[in-house]
Amino acid sequence: MNNAIFPNKFKAALAAQQVQIGCWSALASPITTEVLGLAGFDWLVLDGEHAPNDVTTLIPQLMALKGSASAPVVRVPTNEPVIIKRMLDIGFYNFLIPFVETQEEAARAVASTRYPPEGIRGVSVSHRANMFGTVPDYFAQSNKNITIIVQIESQLGVDNVDAIAATEGVDGIFVGPSDLAAALGHLGNASHPDVQQTIQHIFARAKAHGKPCGILAPVEADARRYLEWGATFVAVGSDLGAFRASTQKLADTFKK
């Protein structure tokens, strides 16, 4: 039996600055996640911050994506080592860490995903990520195959973007446009010129440090603009948004 689970192709694609088009999975359903995995996206965020996800709902979704070319990325609810450890043990290799504001917080996220001496990840010899102990080189390979993407979505995060982007082990910078807009005094209006200028600034600083940048952009014009500005991994929609739009359109068609 071939139990090779490395290398991490999504991590390699980010490092090579290859454009990666993704989608948000927020319905906490293995069926909808499986459908997304068949659609051809390069990566999928399984949201543990704003969606009703936890370990018990995420494992079936990971199973649903087995064999899919779409790389699963988990957004953890908070930058907390025990939560991150549990996500590692169930089989996630790609992490989106919300609300990172300082270099110290970025470094803590990285350390949470690394075994000692590089980090503080707790050791279990048999779990889903190492195929229940059947991957002989898991400990040797894991540290260098984890992807850490940190989310900048506050004024303090913007102020510290250079230090955050320079943090060793951080693979990418992701802009949270809604929270960023709120932090800048434009709640509900991520299209405000001040917000857009700040997004462009974050992209530029990430690029200056050789780090790829990404964003959630469910409006096509926004997504294309961000790609033109240098974003390399962009989530262009969500299962919830697509489901709501299609069902509303269907209802409107027959209820006019």
Swiss-Prot record:
TM helices/strands, residue ranges: none
Secretion signal span: none
Gene Ontology biological process terms, A to Z: D-glucarate catabolic process; galactarate catabolic process
InterPro entries per record: Aldolase/citrate-lyase_domain, GarL, HpcH-HpaI_aldolase, Pyrv/PenolPyrv_kinase-like_dom, Pyrv_kinase-like_dom_sf
Enzyme class, first EC level, given as a word: lyase
Binding locations of Mg(2+): E153, D179
One Gene Ontology CC term in the entry: cytoplasm
Record-marked site positions (Increases basicity of active site His): D89
UniProt keyword DNA-binding, yes or no: no
Pathway membership: Carbohydrate acid metabolism; galactarate degradation; D-glycerate from galactarate: step 2/3
Keyword Ubl conjugation appears in the UniProt entry: no
CC cofactor note: Binds 1 Mg(2+) ion per subunit.
CC cofactor: Mg(2+)
EC number per UniProt: 4.1.2.20
GO molecular function list: 2-dehydro-3-deoxyglucarate aldolase activity; aldehyde-lyase activity; magnesium ion binding
Catalytic activity: 5-dehydro-4-deoxy-D-glucarate = 2-hydroxy-3-oxopropanoate + pyruvate; 2-dehydro-3-deoxy-D-glucarate = 2-hydroxy-3-oxopropanoate + pyruvate
Self-association state and partner proteins as the record states: Homohexamer; trimer of dimers.
Function field: Catalyzes the reversible retro-aldol cleavage of both 5-keto-4-deoxy-D-glucarate and 2-keto-3-deoxy-D-glucarate to pyruvate and tartronic semialdehyde.
Name recorded for this polypeptide: 5-keto-4-deoxy-D-glucarate aldolase
